[in-house]
Amino acid sequence: MNLAAMDPQTYDAQLEHKRIKLEQAFAQFETPSVEVFASEPANYRMRAEFRMWHDGDDLYYYMFDKVLNEKVRCDQYLPASVLINQMMSALIAELKPNPSLRHKLFQVDFLSTLSGEILVSLLYHRQLDDQWRTNAAALKAKLSSQFNVNIIGRARKQKIDLDKDFVVESLQVNDKTFLYKQIENSFTQPNAKVAVKMLEWAIDVTQDSQGDLLELYCGNGNFSIALAQNFNRVLATELAKPSVEAAQYNIEANGIKNLQIIRMSAEDFSDAMAKKRSFRRLEGIDLDSYVCNTIFVDPPRAGIDPDTLALVQGYERILYISCNPDTLKDNLEQLYKTHRVTQFALFDQFPYTDHMETGVLLERTQ
């Protein structure tokens, strides 16, 4: 974290620097001009994590500034949503005078939504007892007069949910509203308004699609649910059990009838498609019945492994969302042999940092 860089007055200049850097890095692939999707310059992050500092009777949030090499007190946090900033003030006022709730509290995590829900996770270096549960329930009741809030307590090998461990986000994407269950301690897009722009872009560049869609690394179904309208059927894979459960919830909540989620890794699915191995999880699923002309991938920062990349390269169209331009560039070295980039986008999920979220659409040339 570099707090000095978080200046809304310099946001446009910082984003332009990213655009230039991205275009230069990918010039060898003869990409079209980068389409840039900006963030709000403040209050854009829907989740935030803070360490807690105990100083006598005082208690406050802090982060570590890697540039200054020191901890920085954070009574408010410019990148965090307005809802998180409001909760930060209300929560600390309740924690300070409560020994049971503040004792050995070392971290607080917030997960908020555009729909107005917020989840607060309190992390401790001690086991939580009945007294903690009673006090936490009273805290939730007090905060509920101002917020739609749920509270979770965490300690080593211990988790206490007072009610539920998730929020339900509501995203307005073009003329449709999509509901997404987001589970505590699972991956979600941190910048909800930019996430909407990503969904709208993906829908736009695939609107003339034929046949079915295959998605790898689908998470909670964020993209596959929104893209289902453009395809006959969608087959999606995800390994993490909580994400798969959230995806099934989201499929039902959004009334999606043409999407099937398989819980398995991209690597295993690649083996299944290549007929190298058979998997019990694929029993009853006729992979050969899918006519997937388009594949969608949103891999982790490490990019796509070689076997999966070979699978991806076999499709006519490849929609690739990347959170790491370096590994995207590495993967394009191979994909560029058979495909050309027809759409190129920069989504500023992480203002005031060097991180760049990118999207490319590749179409087969041979």
From Swiss-Prot:
Enzyme Commission number(s) from the entry: 2.1.1.-, 2.1.1.35
Signal peptide (from-to): none
Disulfide bridge map: none
Xref: Pfam families: tRNA_U5-meth_tr (PF05958)
GO biological process, one term: tRNA methylation
GO CC term (a single one): cytosol
Broadest EC class assigned to this enzyme: transferase
Keyword Transmembrane: no
Reaction equation(s) it catalyzes: uridine(54) in tRNA + S-adenosyl-L-methionine = 5-methyluridine(54) in tRNA + S-adenosyl-L-homocysteine + H(+); uridine(341) in tmRNA + S-adenosyl-L-methionine = 5-methyluridine(341) in tmRNA + S-adenosyl-L-homocysteine + H(+)
GO molecular function terms listed in the Swiss-Prot or TrEMBL record: rRNA binding; tRNA (uracil(54)-C5)-methyltransferase activity, S-adenosyl methionine-dependent; tRNA binding
Active site per database record: C323, E357
UniProt keyword Methyltransferase present: yes
InterPro entries, per database record: MeTrfase_TrmA_AS, MeTrfase_TrmA_CS, SAM-dependent_MTases_sf, TrmA_MeTrfase, U5_MeTrfase_fam
Family under the similarity heading: Belongs to the class I-like SAM-binding methyltransferase superfamily. RNA M5U methyltransferase family. TrmA subfamily.
PANTHER family reported in the protein's UniProt record: TRNA/TMRNA (URACIL-C(5))-METHYLTRANSFERASE (PTHR47790), TRNA_TMRNA (URACIL-C(5))-METHYLTRANSFERASE (PTHR47790:SF2)
Protein name: tRNA/tmRNA (uracil-C(5))-methyltransferase
Native source species: Shewanella putrefaciens (strain CN-32 / ATCC BAA-453)
